[in-house]
Amino acid sequence: MPREIEWSDAEEIGIQLQEKFPDLDPLSVRFTDLHKFVTELPDFVGDPMKSTEGLLEAIQMAWYEEYKDAQ
């Protein structure tokens, strides 16, 4: 059974976003879109209202690391 993820699970979210959007450069994604992408992940159980700029930055950087590794 997949593990439920929250806003603080940046690394796992980054992995899942890379799997879902392998050709999308994370640095080109606006935070409003990133927020939507995260809240639509099937394992995400966090409160959509609890995101912060810092959490979104951490997720974006974790996703970017996965993106770079896949290139």
Language-model segments: which ranges?
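A charge-rich, low-complexity, intrinsically flexible signal that marks solvent-exposed coils, linkers
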Residues: P2-Q71
